[in-house]
């Protein structure tokens, strides 16, 4: 695993996970493989039946200054058409959000795991903290 999104589990109740490819240009692959990227504030939107990851930061590759892309450009995700339609339906009807959870290598290709989630309220976050603390205390005794 190269990069993970720790904020996603705290801010969302993650329900369903999907593995998808990502369309990258030039030196972005090298930059991501050196973990010079951030998906903490990224999210996925479906625009014109294409899944796009927005607000994902990929730092410029230092050695490849002539071929660098915009660090915050929109990147296309590679999903099957049925998966895109299903995600689009759930986002519209149940008011869910699609967030990236991690980036990793699989068979020499970069993959992104995205999750379908519902946003947590402040009281839900507090309940999770209480449950986690209680479980930690019971393990100690």
Swiss-Prot record:
Q: Which Gene3D superfamilies match?
A: 2.40.280.10
Q: Where is the signal peptide?
A: none
Question: What Gene Ontology terms describe what this protein does at the molecular function level?
Answer: RNA binding
The record's section on CDD domains has: SmpB (cd09294)
Q: Which InterPro entries match?
A: SmpB (IPR023620), SsrA-bd_prot (IPR000037), SsrA-bd_prot_CS (IPR020081)
What does the entry list under GO cellular component? Answer: cytosol
Highest taxon, organism lineage: Bacteria
Keyword terms of this UniProt record: Cytoplasm, RNA-binding
GO BP annotations of the record are:
trans-translation
The record's subcellular location field reads: Cytoplasm
The keyword Cytoplasm is assigned to this record = yes
HAMAP family assigned = SmpB (MF_00023)
Provide the function of this protein.
Required for rescue of stalled ribosomes mediated by trans-translation. Binds to transfer-messenger RNA (tmRNA), required for stable association of tmRNA with ribosomes. tmRNA and SmpB together mimic tRNA shape, replacing the anticodon stem-loop with SmpB. tmRNA is encoded by the ssrA gene; the 2 termini fold to resemble tRNA(Ala) and it encodes a 'tag peptide', a short internal open reading frame. During trans-translation Ala-aminoacylated tmRNA acts like a tRNA, entering the A-site of stalled ribosomes, displacing the stalled mRNA.
Q: Which family does it belong to?
A: Belongs to the SmpB family.
Please state what the protein is called. Answer: SsrA-binding protein
User: By which gene is this protein encoded?
Assistant: smpB
């Amino acid at each position: 695993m190269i990069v993970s999104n720790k904020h996603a589990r705290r801010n969302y109740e993650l329900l369903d996970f999907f593995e998808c490819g990502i369309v990258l240009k030039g030196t972005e692959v090298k930059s991501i493989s050196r973990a010079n990227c951030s998906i903490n504030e990224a999210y996925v939107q479906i625009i014109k039946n294409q899944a796009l990851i927005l607000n994902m930061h990929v730092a410029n590759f230092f050695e490849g200054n002539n071929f660098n892309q915009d660090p915050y450009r929109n990147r296309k995700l590679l999903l099957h058409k049925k998966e895109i339609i299903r995600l689009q339906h759930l986002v519209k009807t149940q008011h869910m959000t699609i967030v990236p959870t991690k980036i990793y290598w699989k068979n020499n290709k970069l993959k992104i795991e995205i999750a379908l989630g519902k946003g947590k309220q402040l009281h839900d976050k507090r309940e999770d903290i209480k449950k986690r603390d209680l479980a930690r205390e019971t393990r100690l005794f």
